[in-house]
């Protein structure tokens, strides 16, 4: 006859759980449920009183570790939820919703201030929020709460209100981006080796983020010429480019920033300064109200290093393979004029500037967005220039989609003021118009003369999402500036050195457009900028991409794309056309033809691209360039410790080159730390703790990262003020590891080090028999926990227990009624057969009081008085 002990062990606790979690709410069913106790097949004198479970929705008083779901959205962490018996009717039980838990609901301020509490203000008084329903679904380890939206703050998919924002934990961050290149000339030119890098180090203390940015370069050139002037040349540089600190002000939906910064304004042109600012943080707004993140596009003729800088400070650097590229992960906090430098492996350099677009400065009705800043302008190298300045700007949502905005900026000799109006046109988008007036007093002779200059600048901007057409006009705008109009940056140059202004803006047109025609398999992308000047010729930059996906017989997902581009800088223009045709080759590979025509260099290549897995891909190209054979390869791997890119190029009769790019960082906290990959230097990250279990795969942002030997991993580049999720890939767990909790969430403030812990059990599995000192066994439903407070087994009605996470010599405790009653110690070494009834004596602890938080003791004491002594509350693990 088969042994059904294991079956009873696994199924009996769930019979109780399902009965307890049937339909708990503030509205009780009139009909009771009757149980047949013979179903449990209890032996001996074992007794369990099931009368209390006959009330539908009844939950046995005790502590339950549950995932709280509010209106079908899980909160970030699991909570210990205490159930207490009803005051008037012990057959009913209620969940204790603590003030800390209720604070996560995101209630409106007037609702939260009028809440009433019971049990010495430790539990929310039931029945006071009309329409609120609470259900316990113990089979899913969940507390399901339904709350009318009228009680809650404004929400948006994957965006949480401020009450759920997490400042993270204190710690140290050190991020870096390193690029190395070596180049050998075959025609007697110079050989060169170059290393460049930038990064951020910093400290998090509570809500404060303190950072320091660095950048460095090393270049060694060796001439292959035989003349007497040839020789080696070495250039190297290291500098700390910026010191700064900031913190979030959630109650104001604002950010306080101190130190060296770049003026980011929705109205005025930016410049470097040292000082402080308080500003409404667009990142704290719902995604549909946030600003525009810069989109940088270009074409690399060979494998190239792309550097994005602003006023001399490197803010992004990476390597890209030959062909069109787009950089879209700078974040919406980057604004102003950006300088793009593309260094090709063949030695050519492309440079151009882009002006980042800004959304119309609109605000929700009744709300105000603002910026207040003050300090002193700063040149490169921490040198302060100019007088003390101050400025402010604001946008006020009046009503019916109208917004009024304006601002002022200046010092003793320079003042500018702006006034504008914006309109939300609903289905037709949003439009804004503003006028800025500047008054400049020049005390000494300059290229502009001496005296006062007054000028105006006019701007109109438009933005629209076409959701039904799967397209978006991200930004379209026009700006006209009079000849005597000056920005703060131009005034500083004139007053400091009297230098001639070059590039005195007259008109600027800019537009970014993206559209997908899904049914036709066509996508279009356009980025266009045109500048006219009072003192030099106009400048036009554009990038147009057209792609078409189609099926060709049995070959599916064939694509053809064409890119036309023109970039101009210092009267030097780079323009041309890039054509690509690709088709699948196997499951994860493609073959392609690529042609690049223009700027005096024509090239064509046949390429092979293969994606090895989610983290790794490579590309090989063979072709001709300037009638010479060329071969290049590119390899990229998103590792747990760093992102690694490798490249190699050979151009017949001209040069051979190779490149290496590393992007990563280190995060260290009191909970532990890890090395990791990253792209956003000094940015927000999530430290994962897998209870000391190594090689646990964690998915969060991009390819999976694996926990290190200490069971820690970091998910980097997570979104600020956005509901981020990380989860364990259960299909790739190490052998003898189990995850009883595999998903965590976090909504983190900017720059935070979030911390989340997974319940992971590592070790062997065993079937054991537990016996107390008097020969009896622990009661049915007793929990076996390890020293990490993880439940590793439940006792059945015969004292049998199926254990997980078994390790030689490990200590465990057996709990019932919420108390650890006895201890067991596993043998060392473990027997070869762990499924042959391993006997584990349980040593009695004596009279041990329940260990419960002080703030919940009144609840536990009350429930204990109302529970029959022969049937103590059962502490049920939600993870079983």
Residue ranges of predicted features:
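Post-signal-peptide, soluble extracytosolic/periplasmic N-terminal scaffold domains
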Residues: 2-18, 28-290, 599-667, 677
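Short, ordered, surface-exposed loop/turn motifs in non-cytosolic proteins
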Residues: 60-69, 73-83, 692-702, 774-788
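A short, amphipathic beta-strand motif
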Residues: 68, 296-298, 686-690, 764-773
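Short, acidic Ser/Thr/Gly-rich low-complexity loop/linker segments typical of extracellular
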Residues: 80, 703-712, 789-800
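Short Pro-Gly-centered beta-turn/loop motif in secreted/extracellular proteins
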Residues: 88-97, 330-335, 711-738, 750, ...
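Conserved, compact domain cores that house catalytic/ligand-binding motifs in diverse enzymes
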Residues: 164-228, 368-443, 471, 610-616, ...
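Feature captures outer-membrane beta-barrel proteins of Gram-negative bacteria and organelles
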Residues: 165, 193-207, 231-250, 386-400, ...
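Transmembrane beta-barrel strands of outer-membrane/channel proteins
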Residues: 176-180, 212-216, 256-262, 372-376, ...
């Amino acid at each position: 006859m088969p042994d059904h002990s294991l079956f009873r062990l696994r199924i009996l606790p769930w019979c109780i759980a399902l009965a307890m979690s049937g339909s708990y709410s503030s509205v009780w069913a009139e009909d009771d449920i009757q149980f047949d106790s013979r179903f449990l097949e209890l032996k001996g004198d074992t007794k369990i009183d099931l009368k209390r479970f006959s009330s539908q929705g009844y939950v046995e008083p005790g502590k339950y570790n549950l995932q709280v779901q509010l209106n079908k959205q899980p909160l970030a962490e699991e909570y210990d939820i205490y159930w207490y018996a009803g005051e008037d009717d012990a057959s009913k039980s209620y969940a204790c919703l603590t003030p800390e838990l209720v604070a996560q609901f995101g209630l409106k301020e007037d609702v939260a201030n009028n809440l009433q509490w019971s049990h010495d203000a430790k539990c929310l008084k039931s029945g006071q929020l009309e329409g609120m329903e609470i259900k316990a679904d113990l089979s899913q380890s969940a507390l399901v709460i339904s709350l009318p939206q009228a009680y809650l703050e404004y929400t948006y998919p994957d965006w949480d209100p401020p009450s759920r924002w997490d400042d993270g934990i204190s710690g140290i961050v050190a991020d870096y981006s390193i690029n190395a290149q070596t180049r050998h000339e075959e025609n007697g030119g110079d050989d060169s080796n170059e290393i460049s890098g930038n990064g951020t180090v910093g400290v998090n203390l509570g809500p404060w983020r303190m950072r320091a940015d660095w950048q460095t370069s090393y270049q060694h050139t060796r001439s292959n010429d035989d003349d007497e002037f040839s020789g080696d040349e070495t250039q190297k540089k290291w500098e700390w480019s910026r010191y700064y600190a900031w913190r979030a002000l959630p109650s104001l939906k604002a950010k306080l920033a101190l130190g060296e910064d770049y003026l980011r304004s929705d109205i005025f042109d930016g410049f470097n300064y040292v000082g402080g600012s308080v500003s409404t943080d667009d990142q704290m707004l719902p995604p549909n109200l946030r600003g525009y993140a810069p989109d940088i596009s270009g074409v690399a003729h060979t494998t190239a290093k792309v550097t994005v800088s602003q006023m001399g400070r490197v803010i992004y650097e990476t390597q890209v393979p030959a062909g069109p590229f787009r950089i879209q992960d700078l974040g919406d906090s980057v604004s102003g004029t950006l300088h793009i430098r593309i260094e090709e492996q063949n030695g050519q350099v492309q440079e151009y500037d882009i002006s980042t677009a800004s959304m119309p400065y609109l605000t929700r009705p009744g709300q105000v967005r603002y910026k207040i800043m003050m300090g002193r302008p700063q040149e490169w190298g921490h040198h302060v220039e100019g007088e003390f300045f101050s400025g402010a700007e604001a946008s006020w949502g009046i009503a019916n989609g109208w917004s009024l905005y304006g601002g002022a900026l200046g010092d003793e000799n320079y003042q500018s003021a702006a006034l504008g109006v914006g309109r939300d046109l609903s289905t037709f988008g949003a439009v804004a118009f503003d006028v800025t007036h500047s008054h400049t007093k020049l005390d000494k002779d300059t290229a502009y003369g001496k005296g006062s200059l007054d000028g105006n600048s006019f701007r109109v901007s438009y933005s629209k999402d076409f959701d039904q057409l799967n397209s978006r006009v991200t930004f379209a705008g026009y700006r006209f500036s009079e000849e005597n109009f000056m920005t703060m940056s131009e005034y500083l140059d004139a007053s400091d050195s009297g230098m001639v202004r070059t590039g005195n803006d007259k008109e600027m047109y800019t537009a970014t457009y993206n559209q997908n025609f899904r049914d036709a398999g066509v996508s279009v992308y356009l980025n266009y900028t045109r500048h006219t000047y009072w003192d030099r010729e106009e400048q036009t930059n554009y990038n147009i991409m057209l792609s078409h996906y189609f099926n060709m017989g049995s070959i599916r997902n064939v694509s053809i794309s064409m890119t036309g581009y023109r970039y101009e800088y210092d009267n030097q223009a780079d323009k041309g056309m890039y054509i690509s045709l690709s088709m699948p080759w196997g499951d994860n590979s493609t073959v392609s033809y690529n042609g690049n025509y223009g700027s005096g260099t024509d090239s064509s290549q046949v390429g092979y691209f293969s994606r090895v897995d989610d983290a790794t891909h490579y590309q090989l190209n063979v072709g001709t360039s300037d009638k010479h054979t060329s071969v290049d390869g590119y390899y990229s791997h998103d590792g747990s410790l760093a992102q690694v890119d490798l490249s190699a190029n050979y151009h017949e009769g001209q040069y051979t080159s190779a490149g290496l790019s590393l992007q990563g960082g280190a995060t260290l906290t009191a909970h532990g730390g890890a090395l990791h990959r990253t792209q956003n230097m000094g940015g927000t990250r999530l430290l994962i703790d897998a209870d000391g279990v190594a090689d646990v795969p964690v998915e969060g942002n991009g390819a999976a990262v694996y926990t290190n030997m200490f069971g820690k991993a970091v998910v980097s580049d997570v979104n600020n003020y956005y509901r981020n999720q990380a989860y364990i890939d259960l299909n790739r767990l190490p052998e003898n590891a189990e995850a009883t909790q595999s998903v965590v969430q976090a909504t983190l403030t900017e720059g935070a080090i979030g911390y989340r812990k997974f319940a992971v059990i590592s070790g062997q599995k065993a079937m054991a028999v537990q016996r107390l000192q008097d020969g009896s066994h622990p009661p049915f439903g007793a929990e076996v926990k390890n020293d990490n407070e993880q439940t590793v087994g439940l006792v059945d009605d015969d004292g049998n227990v199926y254990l997980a996470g078994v390790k030689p010599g490990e200590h465990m405790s057996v709990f019932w009624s919420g108390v650890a009653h006895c201890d067991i110690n596993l043998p060392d070494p473990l027997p070869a057969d762990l499924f042959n009834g391993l006997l584990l004596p349980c040593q009695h602890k004596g009279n041990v009081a329940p260990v419960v938080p002080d703030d919940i003791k009144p609840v536990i004491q009350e429930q204990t008085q109302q529970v029959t002594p022969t049937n103590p509350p059962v502490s049920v693990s939600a993870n079983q």
